[in-house]
Amino acid sequence: MMVAAQVIWGSFSLLRVLWCLLPQTGYIHPDEFFQSPEVMAEDILGVQATRPWEFYPSSSCRTVVFPLLTSGSTFWLLRLWEELGLWPGLVSGYMLLVGPRFLLTALSFALDWAVYDLAPLWGADRWNALCLLSGSYVTLVFYTRTFSNTIEGLLFTWLLVLVSPGVVRSPTSKKPTPGPRWHRYLLGVILAAGFFNRPTFLAFALAPLSLWGIHRASELGGIRALIQEALVLLPGAALAAVLCVATDSWYFSSLSRSTGVFLTPANFLYYNLDPQNLARHGTHARLTHLAVNGFLLFGVLHAQALQAAWQQLHACLRASPQTGLSRVRGARGLLSSSKSYLLLFYFTPLLLLSAFSHQEARFLIPLLVPLVLLCSPQTQPIPWKGTLVLFNILGALIFGCLHQGGLVPGLKYLEQIVHTPDLSGTTTHYTLLFTHTYMPPQHLLHLSGLGSPVEVVDMGGAEDRVLCQALNNFSRQPACQLAGEPWPCRLFVVTPGTNRHALEKCRFPLKNETLLFPHLTLEDPPALSSLLSGAWRKHLSLHVIELETPVVTKQPKAQP
């Protein structure tokens, strides 16, 4: 059985790497591009990009440290190789997409290492836990993307690695064995780094740190000794905080050309603690994480966690003081069991994050590691294997391939068009208009940031009338003339098949049309009747349509 589990883990690990390089076409959320690679591509490679509001000095809500370490380091290496002539033509839309993802994919194997190390401590079967981890579509898709939540999950996992020996006993020891002193320094670094990456990291760290503190207090003989132990965390935390503040201050000061100290976590909290600001990003019911997002990400594993929590709560309620001392001791034993601790690690951050009205599924991806440890006990086989496999296949297909799946291939197609040299030697002006899609990450077009003849327009979910008016304006724009000389102009509209009827209302003549399959817009899914018709493929495709533009001719000069 162990050999079979090792083969399964190895197969899923290989799939994780190869699918990253393929690459995955699914587009989960704009934050995977606009909180890291889009910004770093503009800063380091000088390409045309859209800078989100969080990365302006006046509204600096995101630390630049982790974008610099991930996307930034990747783009710097690409630029260096190209400048040295080691790999001419290396920088392309494909490399700008896959480079940062490949780095995150490599870092995701730190999860596997951590689970391998943690499983014996928490009474989990090591290889069953690794199979659950590597086979989860959350690992295959979310942990290979440039989300700040991905970094948060990696830091939370290694926080568990550092505190677990001080909370539970190892199979070879009768009591918890805290690690060496430098572990506490590193723990302080992780706490500060996690807070600067996403202040919500404190919600994930609360339960492990609290249990670590309780156990250390009981071992050291009181609160005073615990305080002295906790002070050991301060040097690492202070060092990481100073480095983050210094990096953010240097970065945002260079953008604003003025010196100042920038505390990005404070700005993040100030913004997100305002309910009106959260409402702009979407308002959800308080039970969304518990009743929807947990199932969406983890499927039957979330159901197992809910069942285990109910059983644990029911057992504790039965062991009340009126039933005798032995029952009380039994209740304490339940509360101090590995299962109880893992349930705390899972449900404490989930419930704390539920206090906020804006709840997205990706906020919960750091909970994957404690969940797979909880659901792979050494004494029991993994239940519902078939359901679990089917669920993860479906999740991987939807979020890794289908969801907004035509947009990244569409940008690659447009990159080839705008970089094809004109045989006549004249410069062509391109207008790329996106409507009813997620924001297009412009850095994947690999356009020069200075004087680019390509204009990218994001219309969002514009109404039909607004779209037609915009097309009418762009087809007759003054940009098609430069210093009185005519420019060849090409106008492209990128829209899902479910919205193509809006373009037909505008009555613009079409020059050509390219369909990119598959593309599913969950915000505007195709009707069931259209999927059952013969045109189902058109409704599940992204349409890249070139419109005929009026020929702009140079007006003859008036004779004197």
Curated annotation (Swiss-Prot):
Sequence similarity: Belongs to the glycosyltransferase 22 family. PIGZ subfamily.
Subcellular localization, as worded in the UniProt entry: Endoplasmic reticulum membrane
MF annotations from Gene Ontology: glycosyltransferase activity
Pathway note: Glycolipid biosynthesis; glycosylphosphatidylinositol-anchor biosynthesis
Record bears the keyword Protein biosynthesis: no
Membrane topology: Multi-pass membrane protein
Top-level taxon: Eukaryota
Function summary: Alpha-1,2-mannosyltransferase that catalyzes the transfer of the fourth mannose, via an alpha-1,2 bond, from a dolichol-phosphate-mannose (Dol-P-Man) to an alpha-D-Man-(1->2)-alpha-D-Man-(1->6)-2-PEtn-alpha-D-Man-(1->4)-alpha-D-GlcN-(1->6)-(1-radyl,2-acyl-sn-glycero-3-phospho)-2-acyl-inositol (also termed H6) intermediate and participates in the twelfth step of the glycosylphosphatidylinositol-anchor biosynthesis. The presence of a fourth mannose in GPI is facultative, suggesting that it only exists in some tissues.
Enzyme Commission number(s) from the entry: 2.4.1.-
Protein name: GPI alpha-1,2-mannosyltransferase 4
Keywords of this entry: Endoplasmic reticulum, Glycosyltransferase, GPI-anchor biosynthesis, Membrane, Transferase, Transmembrane, Transmembrane helix
Ranges that cross the membrane: 102-122, 126-143, 147-167, 186-206, 225-245, 333-353, 363-383, 388-408
Example GO BP: GPI anchor biosynthetic process
Organism: Mus musculus (Mouse)
InterPro entries assigned: GPI_mannosylTrfase (IPR005599)
GO cellular component: endoplasmic reticulum membrane
Database matches in Pfam families: Glyco_transf_22
